[in-house]
């Protein structure tokens, strides 16, 4: 759905949803832009179709303009990034690049080379179902145990209460009944120290409930997913410097901020391919309020071309 620019203090999406400046203050920046929106019933998919479009448009430009001098260029697309499996089978050596950039950011000018350290946690509870009329001192309600564990985690460390460099525990799923129940979390923090502390805290909470209900009732499975790329990118300041130059040449003001999430670039950086992240112009990812600025997409494409020229020199 292509809509005209924001008018006044709100924008309607197919008469189904309304975005207001009060709820989405960053909309003010996009006054005068042409915005691509959802139809109001599902997500847009700008994360990361916007990046794909920008990369391919830049490639098309280079094919049509052989006078643009550049070095060897490698382009890659990874599936399953959103579930943390995007580079499971990515062959960095075969790819043959020294440095790379993901085009997977959002707001115009975003330049990101810090991301969360990330882990997943699964809690499985084996309850004991007894007729509720005769359950005193016998029943173990697995659903209640799952809820009890969640209540042991700091409420202030939930996504809806955190920003900037603040990490969180995010409860993403609860399933079950009295006899069996499970819950799933993602754990995030930019600081490796605080990240490890969060995992230990969850282990301690699980141990506390094991002491209360007995062995075999509750099981915790923790799995690290990816780590903050900063320590792998900072030794190569030229990668960041050239991104600054490319943006400024495109008329974009660089905004360095931590990613409150992750990219495949984080894992690629640990695989020996330093890979910071560039903006796309997409906003409000993963939901019905998602939109993308066509104007910013054009600047993202120009930033890519500028990077190619700068590295070519």
Over which residues does each language-model region extend?
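Solvent-exposed residues in well-ordered beta-strands and their adjoining turns
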Residues: 78, 104, 124-128, 188-190, ...
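Single conserved hydrophobic/aromatic residue that forms the stacking wall/gate
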Residues: 1-8, 12-13
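Acidic-glycine-rich active-site phosphate/pyrophosphate-binding loop
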Residues: 14-34, 112-124, 276
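Phosphate/diphosphate-binding glycine-rich loops and adjacent basic-rich segments that engage nucleotide
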Residues: 100-135, 139-145
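Short, conserved micro-motifs enriched in small and acidic residues
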Residues: 42-53, 136-144, 291-298
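Glycine/charged-rich beta-loop-alpha catalytic/anionic-binding loops adjacent to active sites
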Residues: 29-42, 126-130, 250, 282-286
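Metal-dependent amide/peptide-bond hydrolase catalytic core
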Residues: 143-313
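Acidic/histidine-rich catalytic neighborhood of metal-dependent amide-processing enzymes
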Residues: 29-116, 156-158, 162-172, 176, ...
